[in-house]
Amino acid sequence: MQRQSRITTLLLLAVMTCGVSLAQDTPQTEISRQITCKYEDALAIIEQQVDATKTFDDDARRIEVLVRAADLLWSHKEANARKAYSEAFALAKRHFKEKGEGLEQEGRLSIRGPDHRYVVINSIARHDVNWSKKLVAELLKEQEDEASSKPTKDAQQAERTAERLLTVATSLLSLDEAASLSFARSSLKFPATMFLTEFLYTASAHNKSAADQFYQEALAAYLNAPMERLLYLSAYPFGNNRDAGDMPGHTIYQVPTDFTPNPNLQRLFVQAILQRVQRFIDNPSDVTAGTRIPDPEEMWLALTRLEKQIHKSLPDLAPAVEVARNGVTARLSQESQRELRGRIGSDNPPSRTFDEQVESALKNPNVNTRDHRLTSAVLYSSKNESVDHVLQVVDKISDSNIRQPLLNWFFFDRSQRALKEQKFDDARRLATRVEELDQRAFLYSQIAKEALKRNADQTSAREMLEDIVDAAAKAPNTTVKARALLAVASLYTRIDMNRAVAVMAEAIECVNRIEHADFTRQFVIRKIEGKHFSMYASIVTSGYKPETVLAEIAAVDFDNMLNQASRFSDKSLRAITTLAIAERCLKSARSGSQKGATRPR
């Protein structure tokens, strides 16, 4: 009976039902010494979170909590975990049917949301691959049935399916290589995308021979596909970071540092292109228009861009490549040839200094083009210029709506660069020039983190951390500001646990003031939007989330952090943070023979 009473107390602390928050009181600043973290309690807390999801209004948040809880329960109560996963999958299917993936707007930029069906499948695959495969087969069958009732194919849906399958495959690489490759193979039924090359490079870092073998399977699958799809297989054999064609979607691939190109794969790929060229020459009317340019133009681009590498590694094929390219050229219009040569020329434009770019921009009579070029010069070519010189150029931009976002972007990047060079004073000085206070506070937190890594004395470390709190107090309530405060709380755990708890309380207050606070996205978008051009980049803000910092402090102060988690006004965030604390308890109980979650201070 006593044990049951104690569990009930813990559940009330966690505020598992939709009712009342216990956070009306002043935040605690003293560390509780009570040891109440026990294995059975942690499991009870997790199961209460599953029950609490029934009160959520947002299906996406409900799915997130169910998946997290099921993942934690699997090793302890598999039947309950399966039930939670099944509920999450049913909700995800309903959510997708009603809303699809959904799009979020960042100015003029649209950002696609996650497909929660595959989020659930991804998590299940870590525990039961066969079950996850059955769920994928179920989705693909439904997709096929739906497509058969439509007069035209949904090409975009097919691409997204391939991307989702490859995302699952990538997540499984370190856990179950065979399962990973199985999911990757299932993607070959759908159009190739840049996700395929990204998977190949990631897989090669785990098992190069397996990745090379899968490449051959992919090449066979896409041998007769439109050139803009086949050319997604152009980068991997040569170890290139870009595709050789004009692709529907493109990126710069992260090639593993120790990656070694495979001449055999290079030969197979070049021979495939030569076969396609010959087919075109034999039957010029049998070509695919392509999303951007027709197949023959894609062939010409690929053979031209890979020419030097082919001469170096496959000299015996170089003559055939030259003949093939000439054959394609002869069948292209003069206008197409000019456009293609222009594309090749833009691959490696002549290098111009910052001042040369500025001078050229200022001569342009079109004010919008001039502003665009000046902005580009500041962002991408001013690395070695003095701050004062760059500021003089920014002043020449006509559109006042561009100047301040550009300055924030410039000083943010300069501060980060100084931080990488361990010039902490310069980094702080530059950060003060960032007028977006939440981003300034985030920069301060990164500077403090690096300084503490290098054993800065506690007095200066405390000064830096308090500077962040002061800057955050003046900043608008955003997830960037909240992450900065969370960073301070985390960093304070190294020097002053009481202060860590107090700052954690401030972070929670900040989060509660943010409408629809979402910490699942590990980046924020910064943007410059002129009248006729837009530029976007992401700031990576990963590492500091409410659940991770609360769990970190819970290793010392379980009861207090469980109480702090109850203060979140958002039900799903309250549940996610509580689950993270319970997970910490499970790990501690397992490693410490249920001695609790305290550690020496």
List the predicted regions and their residue ranges:
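Bacterial N-terminal signal peptides
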Residues: 8-19
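N-terminal secretory signal peptides that target proteins for export/translocation
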Residues: 1-5
